[in-house]
A protein has these predicted regions:
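Short, glycine-biased loop/turn motifs at secondary-structure junctions and
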Residues: 1-203, 207-399
Length: 399
């Protein structure tokens, strides 16, 4: 498979992993049944849907008999309305290991044997790593952490039963690439010798060579999981009940893929469950409401250093230095060095620089550069921004 084709597979799964369109419920339910059959299990008696992972986790806690979890009337009503008795024990035991863990491990072992260590590493780098980083690391992990905090301590065990659905995009992309079309030996060292056939997607691939056939059969056993991942969000597989969730209705990220929104949840589900984040860092909802009317006194009194940094970034470093009474450390031909100390964090240190080239209206623009806290001179700070030592910095023209 060419680099371009691998990129296309990765892009397809990245789009699925970040999708906010309504779930394709029929396709997802077909995927669930196929995943159970592929694991040698009968399909679940009930497939039920919830608007968010939080609601689904509460349903899982109720149906698995965690007696210490207080009954949730809303969850019970939704279960009843979908024909599933809201009774402890209805779900049966978790079948996650059979449906997800074992098939994944078997497929990985067979594909790794087919491609060899170098081929597997190259495949993962070309097709799985980017989707894994953008979807799992930057969306699923913070969402799971937040979800855990929203559940009572005694109910958090149900998160161990969850399958990522769309958030499994990273590793599904790599397996899908194996099924989609074999790569030439030049790209994956052991690929060409082992695979002589070609296949379709991970839902329907078939190989003509013995090595390729083995790999494709392993990937085919993931077809049900892939079907759910293309069509829905997180889900919980139990012997008698499968609990599925809708995808989020909103997902906001910054330019490098981190969850980020200044005035709304960075991830929001239809029932209101969501996660607020600033440049990848989860933040409390009440902070989002306060950001637009912050004062420098509030920032100074914030005891959480990480939240204080979020507040500073939104408030503006220049404004904060001016309003909070920063200490003027010194001035030289490169600018003015300012510093403001905190009791429990490194000092905020910045250089005020005046552009030597006037604007068209004759004014000179002022820039603020954040520099390391141990900076001693404005020249040293400006030099640091260019990756130079102070003695090496000799500007001829400033632009």
């Amino acid at each position: 498979m060419t680099a371009e084709a691998l990129g296309a597979v990765s892009a397809k799964w990245l789009a699925a992993g970040l999708s906010t369109v309504p779930a394709d419920r029929a396709a997802a339910e077909d995927g669930v049944r196929l995943a159970y059959r592929s694991a040698g299990l009968r399909p679940p008696k009930h497939i039920v849907w919830f608007a968010s992972p939080l609601a689904a986790a509460r349903a899982a806690a109720l149906l698995t008999g965690l007696s210490t979890v207080a009954p949730d009337g809303g969850v019970a009503f939704q279960l009843s309305s979908q024909g599933c008795p809201p009774v402890a024990g209805t779900a049966g035991p978790s079948v996650r290991a059979a449906v997800r863990t074992k098939p994944w491990a078997a497929a990985r072992a067979e594909v790794h044997a087919l491609l060899g260590p170098d081929g597997w590493a190259a495949l993962w780098s070309a097709c799985g790593a980017d989707a894994w980083r953008m979807v799992n690391d930057r969306v699923a992990v913070p969402l799971r952490t937040h979800l855990r905090s929203e559940l009572p301590a005694h109910a958090r065990a149900v998160l161990l039963d969850a399958v990522g659905g769309q958030h499994d995009a990273g590793w599904l992309a790599a397996f899908d690439a194996v099924a989609d079309a074999p790569a030439p030996a030049a790209e994956f060292p052991d690929y060409g010798a082992a695979v002589t056939g070609s296949g379709g997607s991970s839902g329907s691939g078939s190989g003509s060579g013995s090595g390729g056939g083995a790999a494709l059969l392993a990937v085919q056993r993931l077809a049900g999981l892939a079907g759910v991942a293309r069509a829905a969000g997180w889900w919980w597989p139990y012997a008698d009940v499968a609990i599925l969730t809708e995808r989020p209705v909103e997902l906001h990220r910054d330019n490098i893929g981190r969850l980020h929104a200044a005035d709304a949840p960075a991830v929001r589900f239809r029932d209101g469950f969501g996660l607020h984040a600033w440049r990848g860092m989860p933040i409390p909802p009440d902070l989002v409401r306060r950001l637009s009317r912050l004062t420098h006194q509030e920032i100074a009194s914030e005891r959480n250093a990480e939240l204080r940094r979020v507040m500073l970034e939104h408030f503006g470093y220049e404004r904060y230095l001016r309003e909070a009474g920063a200490h003027r450390v010194g001035e030289d031909e490169c600018g003015v060095l300012w510093q403001l100390r905190f009791a429990d964090d490194e000092p905020l240190t910045m250089v005020e620089v005046v552009n030597s080239t006037p604007e068209p209206d004759g004014t000179s623009r002022v820039y603020w550069l954040r520099v390391p806290p141990d900076t001693r001179t404005a020249r040293g700070g400006v030099a640091w921004t260019f990756g130079l030592a102070e003695a090496e910095y000799r500007p001829l023209v400033e632009t």
